[in-house]
Each structure stands twice: as C-alpha cells, then as structure tokens.
Amino acid sequence: MEEKDFIVNVGPQGTFKPSGLYHSIPADIDAMFLRYEATSVKKITIYFHGGLVNEKTGMATAIKMEKHFSSIGQTPICFVWETGLIETVASNIGKIADTKLFGKLIKILTKKLSSKLGFDISEGRGAGVTLTNAQVEVELSRKNPFENYTQRNLESKGRGADASTNLPAKPEDLEGEFKFEIESDFELISIVGESKLTIPNAGGGQSRGIIDTALLIKSLAKIAFRVIKRFVGKRDHDFYPTIIEELLRELYIAELGAWVWNNMKVKSNDMWKDNSGISDINQYAGRYLFDKLVDFHKKYPDVQVNLVGHSAGSIAICNLLKMSSSNYPQLIFDKIIFMAPACRIDLFRDEIVLHENRFKTFRMFTMTDSNEKHDLLVPYFYTHSLLYLISGILENEGNDFDAYVLGLERDIKATPPYDSVKEITDSNKFLYEAGKNRTAFSQTDGTASEGLRTQSLSHGSFDDDDATIGSIKFMLS
C-alpha cells in the first residue's frame, strides 16, 4: 500500500497546503474512497498521532500503525499533523537550563523554599535550617533532583505546607529575604546585567529585555509565593518540578515555546472547518475526509468506524466528535481509544462523557501517577512527564497552572482537592463505571484481561508498546 493510500497530511491552518516533504491533496482522499467502494470496505480505523512530533516521526508512526490495523482486517486512515513541539520544548528547556543565571536562580529558590515548606525537618535538618550550597549541588547533580521532596513526605511527618504558621500572605512579604540573597552575590548581579528575560510590561503583556536586580527580586518573590500557594492548596507537582514551572512561567515563558502547544490545539480544531466556497489545497483536510466518509456511510450504513488517538491526538478526536455531531449525527463511532491523552478534562467531558450516543465503546490507556512522575521529560531539569508539563505550564499559553489533563491519573481520581470540580467528577464516574473497563493503567500485571494490557513507562512509547498495541488490536478485531 502506498503512503497516499492511507495517510492524510494536515498542513498549515489545518488545510492541504504543503508544509514539508510529504503532503496530501484532495484527489488522494477521493481515490481512497473509490477504492473502498471497489473493495467493499466494512471496517475503518482513523488514527491520530500525538501533535508533538515532526514530519519524519509522524510519517514513521503512520506507517507503523497502518501495518497493525491492516493485520486485523481494519482499513487504516492515519492523520499526520506534525508540529515538532517536543523537539522545540525539550531543546529550549536544555538551552535555558544551561545558562548561568538559571542555575543561580534555581539554587536560591530551592534553598529558600525547602525551609519555607517544611522540608527542613522532614529531611532531618531541624526547623529553619536551610540547605547548604553543597547539599543543593548534590541534589542538582542527580537525574531526578529532590525526588523525595513531596507532599506525601511532608504530611507523613506533620509538616505539610498548610500546617506552617509563618507562610507569607503576599509576594511582597518575601522580597526582603530575596533582596539579601541577591545583593550579597556579586557574580549574580553581574550575570543579571548581561541577561535578557521575558518580563511583564505596562500593557499587560510581556516583553523581552535586560532587568535590574530590583525587578529580579520582585520576580523571585512572586515565583516563591506561587510555589508556596500551590503546596498549600495541594495543587503542586512536587517540589522541584513546581519550582521549575513557576520559574519558567515568570521569566522564560516566551523562550519555552508555550505558543507551539496553543498553535497545535488550534490546528487540531481548524482541520474540521467547513469547506464551503473553498477549493483545492485551501480546503481543510480533516473536513474533506469527513465529508467523504459521510457520503460513504450514507451508501454503506453498516460500515464500522473507529477512532484511535495518542497524546494530543485525543484533542483532534474530541474536536472531530463536536463537528460530526453537528453535521452528521447518524455516524456513530464504534470504538474510541485514547493512549496517554493530552486533552483537557473539560473538553473530554463536553464531547465524550456527556454524549455517549456518539460512540459505542471507549477505552483509555495511560500511566499510573507514580510512573508518570518517573517519566523524566528532561533529566536533571524537568523531571516529570510531558503531561505534567502541559498541565503545569503549557495550557493557555502559560497562564494556567495544574490544568486538568485527562491522561493524568491524579486528576481523574477525583480525590481532594479535585473532588469538587464538576468536569472531573463527571469524568470520573464515566471512566470508572462498573463493568465498562474504560481505563487501563500502565503497568498492568499478569492478571489483566486481553484488551486491558499495557506496559509503557513513557508518554511517547504507548504506540510502540507491544502490550498496548496488542490490547488495541484485540479490541478492534
């Protein structure tokens, strides 16, 4: 089978416009459905890879999944909609981490916050005894720095942030402490004078430029206050990742590339726009295929259509469901399968949980929270998974923290402080409904039934995991 026989490449703004070495045209999709008619196709599976990869990886994934689906009698359609996010973010994180200024700021923040949050006693140092420079250096030399600095460890010793009595009421309360730290470090002052950072401007936006020590003091106080507030509200992502998230949000959001994530989400929606009055490669690729699928379904209403999505592919599927229900509700999808879904829980609730009439079966494969926290996105620097980074800083172009993401077990369990969030409790009831087997957490043990087995230990590896792929093939057979 040639690539054009099963791959739909989505270009800029969700159209057929070329964006790389490979591109699709409307005629390719026309030919697909002519072949389906000629061969009396009865089962179609549409696959969406994660919107986090480049063209080469997206194409390789499509070719791999085509073989899996074809081997069980499914006719595959694989969307390739590359954005390169993972390369952009990982590369930018590495560049930021390598700067002298960043290294200095991390040391200042970890020393100050370890004591403020109660890790002084929980780690056996005694009340008010801060980490030494040598201790900080030792932690930062580890692939997973401050791994044991968690809410659970604090609470087990009665030292949760909410148990402290000397916490600041506002960021300004911390400025004096950071003022002493910064103004006594002449090397840091010199580095600050040579560094450009992204800072809030008078217009309410952000601009990039040199900052002075006074502004840096205010920024560090804001970062520390937000970390403390997240710990008190139990909305943290553990000690070190939370500090990294808030430091990036305050001073490095533009350099991080949060805009890439937003652009990917926009593309996942744009591809389903109406093509009325548009022609040729200016048409929206997803909608063009959908309209052809509708015509095919009208002729052959017994055709089975499945949707499978990995990571951000779940967002594309949710957007497809919204559009499909408005334009052709007669198309009921047979099975919807998510792997490590990166969609927000409110989107999932609105398009899947509240509309079970749109499909027959749903299942999600994702990691346990423990495994999610040991999937090191960037060792030594951001030490939780990509889904944690999305939740912590990428949603809403950096303006949201601890956004609710479907693939994170900690969010869908609906335990405090998430037990009063409506979209979470609604989704929890759906996902854990007795007898439905809608969730499988990696790694499953030897007692897991066929169709519920998964062994992946990294966000990006679900589509390479034999157990997960075997479960999906079992479901679709």
Language-model features, listed with the residues they occupy:
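A short loop-to-beta-strand scaffold at the N-terminal edge of the catalytic core in hydrolase folds
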Residues: L21-Y36
